[in-house]
Amino acid sequence: SGMNFAVAESGAIGLVTNEGNARMVTTLPRVHVAVGGIDKLIPSFDDAMATLRVLPRNATGQHLTSYVTWIAGGVPTASAPDGKKSMHVVFVDNGRKAVLNDPILSQALRCVRCGACANVCPVYRLVGGHRMGYIYIGAIGLILTYLFHGKDRAKALVQNCVNCQACKRS
């Protein structure tokens, strides 16, 4: 699975969905591997709750999303030989440490990936996500794609931007 955040004080990860798909894919297998950028690591549950106040409101206009799944290690199961699932958390750097050390660029890693900047983008509304991002969409997608994947991948995003700055106001 991915992760919306990983809580350093407990080792738990948080998954936020509306359909419960993340809960399903973490429940079924005997081995759960959660992968996320080092920018997903937050100090405490208080920080996780602050993210939960912002993410659903900006992404879908909800006060709280339908499913918030907390996972802290392997859980008991009858399907595993030793009676317990195993869990592994993998943090990806991919240039994030360098970005974290930059006082201006590090602000991009504070994005919770809610999609609000894409939802207000007139070009995104017309052409959809496949033309507006390699992995990350919207205005923040342009910045993150450039930082993590280079200017060649980000070039198409820049060419699509009409500089209306609706994303900045969102």
Where are the language model's segments positioned?
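Conserved aromatic-histidine-acidic binding/catalytic patches
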Residues: 36, 40, 109, 159
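Structural signal for hydrophobic packing residues in well-ordered secondary-structure cores
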Residues: 49-60, 118-121, 125, 168
